């Protein structure tokens, strides 16, 4: 077959050898349509055909599309972005396009190696953000030939997975014990650490705050081969702060304070302590006369019951759990009486589990806890927060916190708690014959014909 390429519109026509004469007539035929085409550029080799700035290159028995080397080099010259990552990605794109041009690909890799040795790219490479495309990956991309294990072994032989840049000290040793001790830069610091570990803890108040300036991040050693100035690191807690002191000594253990990051909910006084919760669980287990496996089922049922009915201290009687279609009743007295400080503070330990349970129910069918139904909560996305022992934490979304606050305000509206009721031994001698209707303002005032009571 013979191919003919028309420059400009990149049209490739192929005909059999005996039909080459067709090319001689095509120019006139296209001219009748007002198109000026030249079909003089002809070839019998696929490698000499160009289409959309690409030519076919035979590699391992497969024709692959290749750009001109000059166009690939222009990709390397692309440097318009402010992001260093974009520059490295452009180089990787040039690697992909250059596969097949062995010499050009080798030069691109040398250029990439030189670029990564520059100061502005060193940090990028050290953090593992500098991309690279191996020869095996390029061959797989173009030929779809899987990589053999022996080819990957070549990479494993030159990689040191235990090496971390900048993690080791370089120590020069000479003969003589005294010289070695002088050159051991880390010995003194190790000795000080050992002495600190053997020192009694109660030697003085606030011993961890003797030198507050050392409690921050230890600055890295300055490399003698580096240029420029080292960027300073700020201390998290410094002696410039107004810290509590007694007798001129800081009473805080700053070393411990920097590492003291407890779970926030463990400090909430709205949640029962772990000891109180364990005591409640053990007491309920004894009074119900159940084992741990049975208590697991009971706790599931009681948590779901509390989601719908709340954890008010005034609950009494029985709570129910479903066994298929059958209701099984359990007395509330052991659960309420042993709940210290309150039942709601005990149930705060179930907050995350209850939230996940509501979310699971909603994934199967619409489910809104009774607590949310009573407050007329209309947004089903907030159903997971619609129970009165939900524990508000720093992770709770702002919209959910607002909904929880409004539901609590609605639940507490109109409540008037009285310490004492009417003494049963006192009786009144007068009979109240006053008659009121539903339209009256209050029990002491008749209707005002539409006027409300004074505010």
Curated annotation (Swiss-Prot):
Signal peptide: none annotated. Belongs to the potyviridae genome polyprotein family. GO terms for molecular function: RNA binding; RNA-directed RNA polymerase activity. Keywords: Capsid protein, Nucleotidyltransferase, RNA-directed RNA polymerase, Transferase, Viral RNA replication, Virion. InterPro entries: DNA/RNA_pol_sf, Poty_coat, RNA-dir_pol_C. Its EC number is 2.7.7.48. Disulfide bonds: none annotated. GO terms for cellular component: viral capsid. The active site is at residue 5. Coiled coil: none annotated. Residues 182-225 are annotated as: Disordered. It comes from Watermelon mosaic virus II (isolate Tonga). GO terms for biological process: DNA-templated transcription. It is an enzyme of class 2 (transferase). It holds the Pfam family RdRP_1. This is Genome polyprotein. The record marks 174-175 as: Cleavage. It catalyses: RNA(n) + a ribonucleoside 5'-triphosphate = RNA(n+1) + diphosphate. Genome polyprotein of potyviruses undergoes post-translational proteolytic processing by the main proteinase NIa-pro resulting in the production of at least ten individual proteins. The P1 proteinase and the HC-pro cleave only their respective C-termini autocatalytically. 6K1 is essential for proper proteolytic separation of P3 from CI. Residues 182-198 have a biased composition (Basic and acidic residues).
């Amino acid at each position: 077959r013979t191919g003919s390429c028309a420059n400009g519109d990149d049209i490739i026509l192929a005909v059999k050898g005996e039909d080459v004469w067709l090319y001689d007539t095509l120019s006139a035929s296209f001219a009748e349509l007002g198109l000026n085409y030249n079909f003089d550029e002809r070839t019998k080799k696929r490698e000499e055909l160009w289409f959309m700035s690409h030519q076919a290159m035979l590699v391992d028995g497969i024709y692959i599309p290749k750009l001109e080397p000059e166009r690939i080099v222009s990709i390397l010259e692309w440097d318009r972005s402010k992001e260093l990552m974009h520059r490295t990605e452009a180089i990787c794109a040039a690697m992909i396009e250059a596969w097949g041009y062995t010499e050009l690909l080798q030069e691109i890799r040398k250029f990439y190696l030189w670029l990564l040795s520059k100061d502005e790219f060193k940090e990028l490479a050290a953090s593992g953000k500098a991309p690279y495309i191996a020869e095996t990956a390029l061959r797989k991309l173009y030929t779809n030939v899987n990589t053999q294990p022996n080819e990957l072994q070549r990479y494993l032989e030159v990689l040191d997975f235990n090496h971390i840049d900048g993690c080791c000290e370089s120590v020069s040793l000479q003969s003589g014990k005294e010289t070695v001790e002088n050159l051991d830069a880390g010995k003194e610091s190790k000795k000080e650490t050992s002495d600190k570990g053997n020192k009694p803890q109660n030697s003085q108040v606030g011993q961890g705050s003797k030198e507050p300036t050392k409690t921050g991040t230890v600055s890295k050693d300055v490399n003698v081969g580096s240029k420029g100035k080292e960027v300073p690191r700020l201390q998290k807690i410094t002696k410039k702060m107004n810290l509590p002191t007694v007798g001129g000594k800081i009473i805080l253990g700053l070393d411990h304070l920097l590492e003291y990051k407890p779970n926030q909910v463990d400090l909430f006084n709205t949640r029962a302590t772990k000891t109180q919760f364990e005591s409640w669980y053990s007491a309920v287990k004894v009074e119900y006369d159940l084992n741990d496996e049975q208590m697991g089922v009971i706790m599931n049922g009681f948590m779901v019951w509390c989601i719908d009915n709340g954890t008010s201290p005034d609950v009494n009687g029985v709570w129910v759990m479903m066994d298929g279609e059958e209701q099984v009743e359990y007395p509330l007295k052991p659960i309420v009486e042993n709940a210290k400080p309150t039942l709601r503070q005990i149930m705060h330990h179930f907050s995350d589990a209850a939230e996940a349970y509501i979310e699971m129910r909603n994934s199967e069918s619409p489910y809104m806890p009774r607590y949310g139904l009573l407050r007329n909560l209309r947004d089903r996305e907030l159903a997971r927060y619609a129970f009165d022992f939900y524990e508000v934490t720093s992770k709770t979304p702002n919209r959910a916190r607002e909904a929880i606050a409004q539901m609590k305000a609605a639940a507490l509206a109109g409540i008037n708690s009285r310490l004492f009721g009417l003494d049963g031994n006192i009786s009144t001698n007068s009979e109240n014959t006053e008659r009121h209707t539903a339209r009256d303002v209050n029990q002491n005032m008749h209707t005002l014909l539409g006027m409300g009571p004074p505010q």
